[in-house]
Amino acid sequence: MENIHAVYNGRFKFLNDIKISPLSRAYTFSDSVYEVIPFCNSNIIAFDKHITRLKNSCDSLSFKADVKKISSEILDLINKSNHANGYVYYQVSRGIDPIRSHMFDDSISLETFGYVVEHNFISKSLTVMICEDMRWQRCDIKSTSLLGNVLSMNNARNNGCDEVIMHKNNLITEGGASNVFFANDDCVFTPSLSNNILPGITRELLIEEIKQAGIKIEEGQFDVDDLLRAKSIWLTSSTKGLAQVKEVSGKKTNLVNDHQLFKACEEIFVKNFLS
């Protein structure tokens, strides 16, 4: 493996040289939050929005994070990497316990960790599986507590799929690592934000840009049948960009490859953020 630039508690090292305590609350309780900051053609995509979301996640867990220091470390990682295209993964945990305990001591220090890797933003068509959303009730926090996502995503892979689209009580929430959009002939739809949906940065950017372009978009509550009636479905994330769904496993659909509204949204996103 190549030497991957990383930082742990303010010290820059290669990823393989970093040692983390097994009593880190990130390790024992997933008591941590994270952010993924993409950059393309040496330009960071929506840096301030990503930092704001990380701060919001920290605030939700009562982490007193030094946002200025975190921002500086993320920028330093990107500069050290010499990659034109990639992303930074950055994580903040409550810290290291003297011994494992559900109740934490307020005196422990926050633990920070990040690394940078190369990534090419190449659009890929996906086969997805629809599944029940079995995650916890605060998916709006970008927490590392992702076991529900992990189990669903690996079940999808074992069944020949690339991703999942989840529903709770038959209402569409989000993908395993993405937000969901779909379209019919003249309108784009996406589930409204709630405690069951992460406020995706790519989701936010896309909504802003397509509104400015005059494309009709509706946020609301949509069920599985609404999704399956769609002419186009796509997923969005910081690493996927816009990824078109070509098949919903085991379901009859009306999907049109490269539907005009998907192509219009894709062109807008690529022009504004990936070129």
Predicted regions: what is each one?
Residues 1-76, 98-275:
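Helix-start/capping segments and mature chain N-termini
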Residues 92-93, 169:
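Short, well-ordered beta-to-alpha junction loops that form the rim of enzyme active sites
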Residues 80-92, 99:
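Ordered, amphipathic secondary-structure segments that act as subunit-interaction surfaces
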